């Protein structure tokens, strides 16, 4: 990712198309602009989006794998009902906690939301930190059978007990041709390959799926990645986790347990929920409260590192350092780029 410049003469990689390829530039005039706003947990994405939307007549699509669930409010830092009344939001509170929701579901619903917003001459703003959902939106839905959460849980336990290298060796025995195309450290692809073999009875290399192109290729996508200093983000996360607990996160977890969150292995493993589910299962011992709180904070910090690493792989997300900038200023910079190049 690279930090952009904000002035009338600035040329981003997208803007340079005007100079390099007139035909491509002409075709792009007919593309509708979609804003992608990403960043690590605690970077201020929500505040920026709420200020950006009125500036460009936009509506917001959540790119958060847990905000789709009703009742998972405090632990996901879900935007308030008042703000959702003021600015339309999509893909929030659309599922019961026992329902499964995956990247394929996200893709089709996000595309539908974009079409809805654009049909009214407004601007879709996709906001969130779930990297794989952004990847799916940009690249098209994953091919193959839907995920099997129970099978994935078994593989996760296997990795915990025996290590990822042994699981990779297992894949090498079952599908050596595919195994040679990935690294022994690529946990996601190893798990997905074994899952496909388990569900279809065929090797991954035997399948001849045709990749479905993403409909977002019809859009002029302009992406941003909010990048606060790491030290400042750690402090923000500490305060954020503390505030969630003061806002009765543990009571929220109790309510979700009664609603059956355990039946959803994805939701029950979400950071901010899995730690306190374990705490409750242990009988909520007072002496372990501080240790669990620290684990909650540490897990969140580790997740932000993964988010930074993930988005660095996608040059469409231009890094926007946020040190010393207010949410209003950041939103104004993104709006300026939209009016210059959108």
Curated annotation (Swiss-Prot):
Top-rank EC class of the record's enzyme: transferase
Highest taxon of the lineage: Bacteria
EC numbers on record: 2.5.1.75
Binding site for substrate: 41-46
Annotated keywords: ATP-binding, Magnesium, Nucleotide-binding, Transferase, tRNA processing
Signal peptide residues on this chain, from the entry's feature table: none
Pfam families in the cross-refs: IPPT
SUPFAM superfamilies from the UniProt entry: P-loop containing nucleoside triphosphate hydrolases
Binding site for ATP: 39-46
One Gene Ontology term from the biological process aspect of the record: tRNA modification
Listed cofactors: Mg(2+)
Disulfide bridge map: none
Chain intervals for the UniProt region annotation (Interaction with substrate tRNA): 64-67
Catalytic activity: adenosine(37) in tRNA + dimethylallyl diphosphate = N(6)-dimethylallyladenosine(37) in tRNA + diphosphate
InterPro entries in the record: Dimethylallyltransferase, IPT, P-loop_NTPase
HAMAP family in the cross-refs: IPP_trans
Family: Belongs to the IPP transferase family.
Purpose: Catalyzes the transfer of a dimethylallyl group onto the adenine at position 37 in tRNAs that read codons beginning with uridine, leading to the formation of N6-(dimethylallyl)adenosine (i(6)A).
Protein name: tRNA dimethylallyltransferase
